[in-house]
Curated annotation (Swiss-Prot):
One of its GO terms (cellular component) is extracellular space. Keywords: Biomineralization, Cell adhesion, Cytokine, Glycoprotein, Phosphoprotein, Proteoglycan, Secreted, Sialic acid, Signal. The modification Phosphoserine is found at residues 23-24, 26-27, 60, 62-63, 76, 78, 81, 95, 100, 103, 115, 118, 121, 124, 184, 188, 199, 205, 210, 214, 228, 233, 237, 240, 245, 256, 267, 272, 274-275. Major non-collagenous bone protein that binds tightly to hydroxyapatite. Appears to form an integral part of the mineralized matrix. Probably important to cell-matrix interaction. Its main location: secreted. Bone, inner ear, kidney, uterus, lung, brain, epidermis. Residues 83-95 have a biased composition (Acidic residues). SMART domains: OSTEO (SM00017). The modification Phosphothreonine is found at T66, T178, T183, T208. GO terms for biological process: biomineral tissue development; cell adhesion; osteoblast differentiation; positive regulation of bone resorption. Extensively phosphorylated by FAM20C in the extracellular medium at multiple sites within the S-x-E/pS motif. The phosphorylated form inhibits hydroxyapatite crystallization. Dephosphorylation via a mechanism involving ALPL/TNAP promotes hydroxyapatite crystallization. It comes from the Eukaryota. The gene is SPP1. This is Osteopontin.
Length: 278
């Protein structure tokens, strides 16, 4: 305890002592201060007029900055018209009302009767959309007309029957018609049926011509095939003969070469035997 008390006393004494400011100047500056104290004092303490000249541009710059800040802040406030502020207030009120309504709805949903009513209302709000009904293609059977005689074997007889029916109907429908009208009607129908008959005849003639041409072409094609087969067989026989002749020649040449080799060997053996005898 004594040591602690002594330490506190020393700290209090040290804090009570005056602190001398350290001179940050160099030794040359200290010498100048000692030699010319008045000149240094006047240099360190300039005239108030000089201070004002130095401070004037700084004050102008600071005033310009403050003016700019004020101008930037003022438009944001001025742009907000009283109507906009009123709208903002109304929005806040509406949001509060909505929140209150939500809370009321949450309270009322706890009632079973209310839940049933809401369910029925939701079902009534639903709209029944029509379902896609598959479209059925209606097939209309082909009803041949009276003048349609194509595709029948008895087209001529059928045409005569249809004409007689037409004439009977025309007589019944117009009993007052004259013979000239009747003849003109027949002529017009004949003119109308003439191109059909000619087309049928041309088709039949084309079919007959095509059948005749096909009959004529088939034997010619057969003859050509036979002739080509004969030529190929002759060429094959010639080639086979030439091949056999070449084989025979090669065999003869090979045999003659073997005979020559044998003769040479025999002559060499005889020479060697005669030399040994000598």
């Amino acid at each position: 305890m004594r040591i602690a008390v002594i330490c506190f006393c020393l700290l209090g004494i040290a804090s009570a002592l005056p602190v001398k400011p350290t001179s940050s100047g160099s030794s040359e500056e200290k010498q100048l201060n000692n030699k010319y104290p008045d000149a240094v004092a006047t240099w360190l303490k300039p005239d108030p007029s000089q201070k004002q000249t130095f401070l004037a541009p700084q004050n102008s710059v600071s005033s310009e900055e403050t003016d700019d800040n004020k101008q930037n802040t003022l438009p944001s406030k001025s742009n907000e018209s009283p109507e906009q502020t009123d709208d903002l207030d109304d929005d806040d009120d509406n949001s509060q009302d909505v929140n209150s309504n939500d809370s009321d709805d949450a309270e009322t949903t706890d009632d079973p009767d209310h839940s049933d009513e809401s369910h029925h209302s939701d079902e009534s709000d639903e709209v029944d959309f029509p379902t896609d009904i598959p479209t059925i293609a209606v097939f209309t059977p082909f009803i041949p007309t009276e003048s349609a005689n194509d595709g029948r074997g008895d087209s001529v007889a059928y045409g005569l029957k249809s004409r007689s029916k037409k004439f009977r109907r025309s007589n019944v429908q117009s009993p007052d018609a004259t013979e000239e009208d009747f003849t003109s009607h027949i002529e017009s129908e004949e003119m109308h049926d003439a191109p059909k008959k000619t087309s049928q005849l041309t088709d039949h003639s084309k079919e007959t011509n095509s059948s005749e041409l096909s009959k004529e072409l088939t034997p010619k094609a057969k003859d050509k095939n036979k002739h080509s087969n004969l030529i190929e067989s002759q060429e094959n026989s010639k080639l086979s003969q030439e091949f056999h002749s070449l084989e025979d020649k090669l065999d003869l040449d090979h045999k003659s070469e073997e005979d020559k080799h044998l003769k040479i060997r025999i002559s060499h053996e005889l020479d060697s035997a005669s030399s040994e005898v000598n």
